[in-house]
Swiss-Prot record:
Gene Ontology cellular component annotations, sorted alphabetically: cytosol
Domain of life: Bacteria
Gene field: smpB
CDD domains per record: SmpB (cd09294)
Organism: Bartonella tribocorum (strain CIP 105476 / IBS 506)
Protein name as it appears in the record: SsrA-binding protein
Subcellular location as annotated: Cytoplasm
KW Cytoplasm (keyword) present: yes
Amino acid sequence: MNKKKNAPVRKIIADNRKARFNFEILNNLEAGLVLQGAEVKSLRSNHANIAESYASFENGELWLVNSYIPEYTQANRFNHEPRRLRKLLLSKREMARFFNATSREGMTLVPLKLYFNERGRVKLEIALARGKKLHDKRETEKKRDWGREKARLLKRYG
């Protein structure tokens, strides 16, 4: 008999749910990260926080700023700094496109997910985003509440 192929496994380490509420997501992209060994071991134990982080350009390179990967407890003197800058790996074309987009006013690069891909490599899903105004956030909340209410009504009477 034919064996079914399993869907690719993406083990999510950290998810930035706040970004989807605070920003209007325009374009997503997967980027690699330059990490040290102790950082990867710490990530394998699902410890990371990217909620307050962002990506910025310095000297033609893209860096992840303010991400938190705690020190690995079994590592000794070779441990890493938890809030250090981490280089993002993108092709030159993608980097140029993002650089041009972020140079426009109101655009920023926000990390959405940190995960292990099918090959066991740590990847970061970053998005080109524009900040939402307060009234936009309220409108999004109203739409979400109405969707939930609609689902309840359909379940009860439908």
